[in-house]
Amino acid sequence: MVSQDSCDKVTKKYAQLKLFSYFCVMKLAPVALFVYNRADNTRRTLEALARNTRARETELFVFSDGGKDEKSWKRVHEVRSTVKEFVEAFRKLELVERPENFYLERNITEGIAEVFRTHDRIIVLEDDILTSPYYLQYMNEAFELYNEEPRVMHVAGFTNLALPDVPFYFTPHMSGWGWGTWRDRWNGHFRHYTSREEALDGLTAADLDRIQYGGVFRCLQSLDKRPIPWDICWEIAIYRAGGLCLTPGQTMVRNIGLRQGTHFRSWSLLQRYEFDREPSQQPLPLTRIENPEKDEAVEARFAQAITDWGIRYTPLGKMLRFIYNGKHIK
């Protein structure tokens, strides 16, 4: 008679071999990179992406927005020349040159739609996002593991938390820096709203309170911008659908362009320390969780993190927290 221990070992070995085969043959998502007029940032973004372990197996679509005037067109051409230097770094590089200035929101939403005509999942980067060498591996594993779980609508590359004991977690809050989604989730739920009234139609005061984490996360202020940013539209879409965002416990991306970005305001620089951390240099272990739910403990930490301007990552912030709280908070 075969012992239970022997059966367990065979079962474990079979599961390991099945998982190995699963990820060796998995379908890799294309990357859509959106660029405008920052050649230096674009180069750094592409260099980091090219260092990814799955870069040479990955299709890259670069959507280059057009200029607004003669000066900006000159910088746009510099960006396009920079992109062409990386044609050998990926399985395929397709450069889409916009003939006019689409602006960020239109360039992104139309670019995503173009990729989804031929692919069922997408990884989205902008021209100021440095990725971990294991970023593409992480994103594609997440796509494979949760492809059949429609509640998981978004895969994030960034977290403003640092959770060394939590490889990944689920939250209704999306991060738009180095993210990805599936065609059925995006096409089924995303709407690019044109007014605050349209965006919030049917939502209650309690809904708005939950979206804004009790008022500390004032994301709905973005609804007063014109055009309305795509990311707040997606945030609301995920909330309306009861969706979740798979998010890493350690950030897999770093934003290097806030000082120059389209939506950046100089007065908010002091709030951006947390966004300028080095991405993880280690693979992120992912597993399939049945019936995923948001982690209430992590949600509480996120709500707290929003209020401290990210200075907990600076030496001064850590010292102040040690003095006032009697312990370090990562």
Where are the language model's segments positioned?
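An acidic/histidine-cluster motif and surrounding catalytic segment
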Residues: 26-124, 129-330
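Leucine-biased recognition of intrinsically disordered, low-complexity hydrophobic segments
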Residues: 17-19
